[in-house]
């Protein structure tokens, strides 16, 4: 596959990942994870704890579904990509994906913004799949960079 083809396939994986978690309140179709993630993928949520220290929670796919399922069941949630950069080398890729999270697509301002740092592998049988994803949100002193 050409580099342009790889970039298009990577883009489709990222688009599916956002589509999978976004929507009105209700259960998510977690079987869609197979369209985006390697079965052994890790998702890492980061935050600043009450003491002002960086903290993280490392989750497998089932952990993520279990941890976020109750939130999605009760809340409208839309995560919209607002910037993307793909770095590609052979069978590995890195995507910087800036996002806005909203309870409604009509909200004037997002609830939060941040960046997903996503690493992918070109699986010979399934194509590009996310191996790891770590994210952080904007906060005082930390703003999204430009994605020109």
Where are these regions (language model features)?
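Short beta-strand edge/turn micro-motifs at domain boundaries
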Residues: 94, 113-144
């Amino acid at each position: 596959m050409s580099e342009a083809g790889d970039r298009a396939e990577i883009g489709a994986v990222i688009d599916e990942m956002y589509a999978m978690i976004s929507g009105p309140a209700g259960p998510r179709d977690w079987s869609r994870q197979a369209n985006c993630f390697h079965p052994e993928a890790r998702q890492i949520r980061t935050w600043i704890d009450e003491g002002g220290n960086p903290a993280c929670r490392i989750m497998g796919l089932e952990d993520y579904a279990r941890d976020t399922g109750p939130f999605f069941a009760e809340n409208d949630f839309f995560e919209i990509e607002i910037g993307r950069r793909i770095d590609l080398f052979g069978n590995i890729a890195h995507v910087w994906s800036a996002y806005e999270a909203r309870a409604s697509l009509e909200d004037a301002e997002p609830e939060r913004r941040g960046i997903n740092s996503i690493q992918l592998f070109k699986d010979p049988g399934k194509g590009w799949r996310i191996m790891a994803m770590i994210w952080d949100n904007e906060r005082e002193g930390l703003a999204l960079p430009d994605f020109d």
